[in-house]
């Protein structure tokens, strides 16, 4: 986290925590592959928290988080509180391995400190989302 903080403090936007890699464990001085996944969304939320960021931006394939996704009554969400997100999670509104981890990571970040905001949106709409013009903002 130290090098990321130096870069951040220089005024540079930090893009990190990509996918990939092979998880291993060390036994008897040897490395062995192990079934594990480091989720990019959760890792990004944790890094943003450790960097004391005000905003976490999670980029995805849709402009907004939606309920009833893919159905005639689909509704894009402009804002989402962690409590609302939990309700929708209980209703199974978000696909596991797709939107669910993004929403959970956004909730975790938003709840980690007052005033924090997580934005979920398209790469092409990131600037507009940061300006508050689009995307889904998750905050307390």
Language-model features: locations:
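ATP/nucleoside-binding phosphotransfer catalytic cores, i.e., glycine-rich phosphate-binding loops
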Residues: 67-140
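Active-site loop/turn elements of alpha/beta-hydrolase fold enzymes
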Residues: 59-62, 123
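Active-site rim beta-loop-alpha module in soluble metabolic enzymes
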Residues: 8-28, 62-79
């Amino acid at each position: 986290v130290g090098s990321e903080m130096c870069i951040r403090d220089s005024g540079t936007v930090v893009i990190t925590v990509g996918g990939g890699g092979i998880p291993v464990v060390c036994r008897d001085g040897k490395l062995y592959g192990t079934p594990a996944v480091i989720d990019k969304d959760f890792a990004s939320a944790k890094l943003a928290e450790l960097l004391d960021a005000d905003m976490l931006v999670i980029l995805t394939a849709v402009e907004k988080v939606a309920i009833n996704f893919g159905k005639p009554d689909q509704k894009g969400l402009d804002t989402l509180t962690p409590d609302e997100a939990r309700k929708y999670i209980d209703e199974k509104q978000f696909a596991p391995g797709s939107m669910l981890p993004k929403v959970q990571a956004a909730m975790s970040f938003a709840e980690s400190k007052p005033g924090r905001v997580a934005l979920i949106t398209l790469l092409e709409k990131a600037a507009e989302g940061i300006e508050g013009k689009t995307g889904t903002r998750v905050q307390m």
